Structure formats: structure tokens, C-alpha cells
């Protein structure tokens, strides 16, 4: 989902499951999540492009001979087009990332006529000490019922905890007691 606002454009995707997910779906969701985290935590030099990051996002799926047929991310416009360049995270993109750019981070996997998985956040490109890194702009919880936590390393578990804590600390003040309790369950 997403929207156009006078002060910016949003784009976010979450996969949720309304029944008990199979182990296969949990495993694939976790590979996608690991790719998503790999992008979000990338520490790049100032000459790196979206192509290098795309490889990181696909790594865990490719180890299982799985992939997705779209770029990992696209540039996001400001009250114009949601998909806007020249920056993107894809196999073909050779544009150097620069501070101030906004991109999506949206690896996924799709099994035709069966299921689809995508985790999408918007990320802001920052330059810190001549390194490129990303700041998450999207604050929406990730369904923990779909995660195989045994497949996450300590860094990935820490990232997920910190992300959910930031989501809670940022938006809980706008929520009812019941909504806060639900949101706290992701931490």
C-alpha cells in the first residue's frame, strides 16, 4: 500500500498469514527477510550502485535456487511517481547512490497460483564518514509468525528487535491501550 501526500510519497508492503504457515512458507519468508535486512544494514562505499545491493538481497533465496523477477528496489518520487529514477536496486542499475535519495527495499518470492511474499520499506540514503548506509523510513511491523528464528543470526535478530522497538516507540503514543498491546507483541 502507499499514498501520495503534499509532503511526500509512501510505499510499503507486508505479507501476513491468516492461518498457520507451512514450514516451507516460513523458510522462504525468512530468506526474503534476511535479504531485506542485508539491504537495510548495508555499509557501502560512495562508489557502490544498486546492482551490488541487489546481489545481497537475493543471496539467501539463490542459495535455495529461488529468485524473484523484479528489482529489489526503485527510486521513490516526491508527490509525482512512486517508481522514479534514476536510482534503483536492481541487476541492471549502475547509478551511484547519493545522500538524500529514497529507495524501496522490497525483496520477495512468488509461487504462481500458490502464494506471494514481499517485505517492503522505504529507505533513505545517508553518507556517514564517506560510507553509504540506509535509514528506514517505514514503520510497520513484520509478521513474526512467518519467521523461522532458528535461521536468523544474532545480527539479524538484533536488527529485527531494534526495528520493532523503533516502530513501537515512534507510533505507540498515537494508539489506544489495546493497539499498543498488539504492537508491543512484535518486540
Where are each of the predicted segments found?
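Active-site neighborhoods and metal-handling regions in enzymes and metal-associated proteins
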Residues: 1-187
